[in-house]
């Protein structure tokens, strides 16, 4: 299921692959977010051309906006969306818990009010697994509580215990799965920013021996130093035989630091989100295309990029589209940013294989931090 091809000589970075039901996924892996089964503004063909073999979809949104019965009629999410590569589906717990005034937690699950239409629902750990089984998800993520930065120890302890209980019940559900379904369950560790809670959570999750481990509840508004501290601490407790997934990170510097600590998989909607403000990822920093200096700029956004934008259109034209709020501008910018992320990951893999990750990381982060990145 999981194999490591090369470990970096100096750090914990590594290159390898996961064998999943819908094909091989090379690691390190950046996973684009396709909340409803598609990335905003992009055809599946764009991702397929980039050899994207793993996309994240959101159980919360699919359940509430589409309905489980519809997916069941199509015999799974792959048939419904015609995406023939792998899906990782998360529980949507982060979304539920972001509306603290609209939900109530108990030992079995969470009662919540849908913020769009006011309807009431109840998610349980077993129910969330059953939904994702119907989806035919290649990687299933259980229901968990992603707690906020700054809460007190007692609250963090309670949420950590509940998350562990939910993980245990989800694991039991995975042992009674439908015949023929062979998706993998990755369990999530929590603990907020308290090291003893992190350690206990990881040890409890490891006892269940799921195929993969996710580190949840970081990159939630904490200072970067605290993020790195907990990331390193958590990594050291997870066996190297397990694929490691950090949830919700996707900016270049966060990815490079995660790979440095031995993280294999990450996801983030940031590359698509920042295009709404005309922000483009480049090797020279984030380009804010809305600036006046680009109004009459006839050059391409980036010379070495082969996305539709960089092959055909000028900076000035893209600025015009973004300023005019033309959807086509967002589509072009989104495709460019996804191209950039996959190109970056490809360079990182090559650097690890060539024993050059130290130089690559140092030079990239130096340039990154010198530039004016408006995230």
UniProtKB/Swiss-Prot annotation:
Domain of life: Bacteria
Function field: Catalyzes the base-exchange of a guanine (G) residue with the queuine precursor 7-aminomethyl-7-deazaguanine (PreQ1) at position 34 (anticodon wobble position) in tRNAs with GU(N) anticodons (tRNA-Asp, -Asn, -His and -Tyr). Catalysis occurs through a double-displacement mechanism. The nucleophile active site attacks the C1' of nucleotide 34 to detach the guanine base from the RNA, forming a covalent enzyme-RNA intermediate. The proton acceptor active site deprotonates the incoming PreQ1, allowing a nucleophilic attack on the C1' of the ribose to form the product.
Listed SUPFAM superfamilies: tRNA-guanine transglycosylase (SSF51713)
GO molecular function: metal ion binding; tRNA-guanosine(34) queuine transglycosylase activity
Cofactor annotation comment: Binds 1 zinc ion per subunit.
Involved pathway(s): tRNA modification; tRNA-queuosine biosynthesis
Cofactor(s) named in the record: Zn(2+)
Pfam families: TGT (PF01702)
Family the entry assigns: Belongs to the queuine tRNA-ribosyltransferase family.
Endpoints of the signal sequence: none
Annotated residues for binding of substrate: 90-94, 144, 190, 217
InterPro entries noted in UniProt: ArchSynthase1/Queuine_TRR, TGT, TGT-like_sf, tRNA_ribo_trans-like
Residue numbers annotated as active site: 90, 267
Stored HAMAP family: Q_tRNA_Tgt (MF_00168)
EC assignment: 2.4.2.29
The reaction(s) this protein catalyses: 7-aminomethyl-7-carbaguanine + guanosine(34) in tRNA = 7-aminomethyl-7-carbaguanosine(34) in tRNA + guanine
GO CC annotation terms, alphabetical: cytosol
The name this protein goes by in its record: Queuine tRNA-ribosyltransferase
Positions that bind Zn(2+): 305, 307, 310, 336
Positions of the UniProt region annotated as RNA binding: 248-254, 272-276
């Amino acid at each position: 299921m999981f194999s490591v091809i090369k470990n970096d000589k100096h750090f914990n970075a590594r290159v390898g692959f996961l064998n999943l039901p819908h094909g091989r996924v090379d690691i390190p892996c950046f996973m684009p977010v396709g909340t409803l089964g598609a990335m905003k503004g992009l055809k599946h063909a764009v991702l397929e051309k980039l050899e994207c073999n793993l996309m994240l979809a959101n159980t919360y949104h699919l359940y509430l906006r589409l309905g489980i019965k519809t997916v069941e009629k199509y015999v799974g999410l792959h048939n419904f969306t015609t995406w023939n590569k792998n899906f990782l589906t998360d529980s949507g717990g982060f979304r539920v818990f972001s509306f603290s005034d609209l939900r109530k937690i108990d030992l079995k699950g969470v009662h919540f009010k849908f913020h769009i239409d006011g309807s009431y629902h109840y998610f349980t750990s077993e129910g969330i697994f059953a939904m994702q089984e119907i989806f035919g998800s290649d990687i299933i993520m259980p229901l968990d509580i992603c707690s906020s930065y700054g809460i007190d120890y007692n609250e963090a302890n309670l949420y950590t215990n509940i998350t562990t209980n939910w993980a245990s019940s989800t694991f039991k559900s995975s042992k009674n799965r439908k015949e023929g379904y062979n998706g993998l369950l990755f369990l999530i560790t929590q603990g907020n920013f308290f090291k003893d809670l992190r350690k206990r959570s990881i040890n409890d999750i490891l006892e269940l021996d799921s195929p993969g481990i996710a580190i949840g509840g970081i990159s939630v508004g904490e200072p970067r130093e605290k993020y790195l501290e907990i990331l390193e601490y958590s990594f050291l407790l997870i066996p190297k035989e397990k694929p490691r997934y950090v949830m919700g990170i996707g900016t270049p510097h966060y990815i490079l630091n995660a790979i440095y600590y031995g993280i294999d998989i990450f996801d983030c909607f940031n590359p698509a989100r920042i295009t709404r403000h005309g922000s483009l990822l480049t090797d020279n920093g984030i380009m804010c295309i809305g600036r006046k200096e680009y109004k009459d700029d006839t050059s391409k956004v980036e010379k070495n990029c082969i996305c539709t934008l960089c092959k055909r259109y000028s900076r000035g034209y893209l600025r015009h589209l973004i300023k005019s709020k033309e959807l086509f501008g967002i589509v072009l910018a989104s495709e460019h940013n996804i191209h950039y992320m996959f190109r970056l990951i490809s360079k990182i893999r090559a650097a690890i294989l060539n024993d050059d990750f130290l130089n690559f990381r140092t030079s990239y982060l130096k340039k990154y931090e010198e530039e004016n990145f408006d995230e």
